[in-house]
Amino acid sequence: MKKEYIKSPMNYIGNKYRIMGQIQKWFPRKIDTMVDLFCGGCDVTINTDAQTHYANDINYHVIDIFTEFQKYSTDYILEYIDGTIKKWHLSKTDAEAYKMFRDYYNSTKEPLDLYILMCFSFNYQFRFNSNHDYNNPFGKDRSSFNDVMRANLIKTLDRLSNIHFTSKEFQNYDFGVLKQGDFLYADPPYLITCASYNDGKRGFTGWSEREEINLYSILTDLDKHGIKFALSNVIEHKGVKNDILAKWYRDNKYHLHRVNFNYNNSNYHAKNTDKVTKEVLVTNY
């Protein structure tokens, strides 16, 4: 029987919902403790069975939303969302109401309000300026807190109870929570793409060769301590190859698995079929 996956209510760019079936077939069959090092909207975390979950992301605004979700009942959260939408007259068409609510959020920084704001924003992006004010434009005629997002939110809320959330740069993460045989999943920004979340212009540190090399060094060290890992990445994009990734997995004799997917709603999609994006999953087991 085909497993039914839960889609995160975040609609995070680069999320793994549509390829969960592909990457999970290479995950360990039994997981005691799992760390999702770049969890984003938590699609992988909420869809992977483990005794204990740790979910981390540098974007503390997103982590604050999840920890806020953990504090309250599903009924309370839905009532808050519905009441706020009504109070501020938020809709697919009222750009002025959106801007007023965005200004209000930027003055209060209430996590649940940020979630609502994201629901009505362009492409559902979490985009911030250097002052960490939310600055994503209005998603006119496209974005809203619709019935599908409501259903996804309800399903997600049921899966958050045993997840420990943190917001740290990956270099500063406490890997001491992992013991031999445990599992780490890493879905970092992709070095050779130009996605909006790794350009260093969203209020958070960008991604460069330095971060790429540091991450691989950490994964190699975890491997030496008997910890299993799976790394999502792109090895080729529009004719550009990630030579750092290729050398690292070959030198360490890790396993490279091809993933068949195109990100049609972001900068990954290439019209020239000769220059498609080649996404992979690297495992050490």
Residue spans of the language-model regions?
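SAM-dependent nucleic-acid methyltransferase catalytic core
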Residues: 2-19, 25, 29, 74-185, ...
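A short acidic (Asp/Glu
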Residues: 46-48, 65, 176-177, 194-199, ...
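Active-site flanking residues adjacent to catalytic metal/cofactor-binding acidic residues
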Residues: 35, 56, 168, 186-188, ...
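Short helix/strand-bridging catalytic loops that position acidic/His residues to coordinate divalent metals
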Residues: 198-209
